Amino acid sequence: MMIKQAELKRLERRVDYTFSDFSLLQQALTHRSALGNHNERLEFLGDSILSYAISTDLYARFPKVDEGDLSRMRATLVCGKMLAEIGREFQLGDCLILGPGELKSGGFRRDSIIADGVEAIIGAAFLDSDIDTVKKLILKWFDSRLNTIEPGISQKDPKTRLQEHLQSRKQPLPIYEVLEIKGEAHNQRFTMSCSIDGLKSVQGQGTSRRKAEQIAANKMLDSLSGAK
């Protein structure tokens, strides 16, 4: 299968990076099941660069946190599930180049293939630019997650922690609502509310609905901590 150039240009806008060497992006999207130059070497490179970018940011962000907590936070941020979430925010599955068998079995929806594609794009962007540029790009992708992760606690995302907190107290689950969507389709900003019975609702903003919900959930967790 081939991906139209117009779709790849839209993907560039979603990932917020424009390739000088367009063939690197095409290779990053090519699974080994497809004919041609596949993405496994780029994935290998991207995995190391991702670990470097997240490690250095966590090291600077948490100067008093020990190696164990830093490692746990990094593992949470760079795990396959998290990378697949980011890939879905980019609608990466629609752009993957798969062989007929993988395509038929729904490989474009598989977490592992999407996560590998994200790492391959990181590797491709590094070869296309430099380490500082690609580090800034990675930190932009992970911004809301880096802003909500904390040491010394279960490394679950804020929505999950909020849900488990309420369920443990047999309270109704939170309600999330879209308050506003601004911007063009490729550059939208969402404002979401999070409401719980008996507490003032809070708002979160982000470049995707999920990011805005996570930020709102984190604010609600802070409100619940203050209410204790």
UniProtKB/Swiss-Prot annotation:
The reaction(s) this protein catalyses: Endonucleolytic cleavage to 5'-phosphomonoester
Transmembrane portions of the chain: none
GO biological process terms held by the UniProt record: mRNA processing; regulation of gene expression; rRNA processing; tRNA processing
GO cellular component: cytoplasm
Keywords on record: Cytoplasm, Endonuclease, Hydrolase, Magnesium, Metal-binding, mRNA processing, Nuclease, RNA-binding, rRNA processing, rRNA-binding, tRNA processing
GO molecular function: double-stranded RNA binding; metal ion binding; ribonuclease III activity; rRNA binding
EC number: 3.1.26.3
Binding site for Mg(2+): 43, 116, 119
Cofactors: Mg(2+)
Domain called DRBM: residue spans: 157-226
Positions of the catalytic residues: 47, 119
PROSITE patterns (UniProt xref): DS_RBD (PS50137), RNASE_3_1 (PS00517), RNASE_3_2 (PS50142)
Domain RNase III: 8-130
Function comment: Digests double-stranded RNA. Involved in the processing of primary rRNA transcript to yield the immediate precursors to the large and small rRNAs (23S and 16S). Processes some mRNAs, and tRNAs when they are encoded in the rRNA operon. Processes pre-crRNA and tracrRNA of type II CRISPR loci if present in the organism.
Assembly description: Homodimer.
Similarity-based family: Belongs to the ribonuclease III family.
Stored HAMAP family: RNase_III
Protein name stated in the entry: Ribonuclease 3
Biological source species: Psychromonas ingrahamii (strain DSM 17664 / CCUG 51855 / 37)
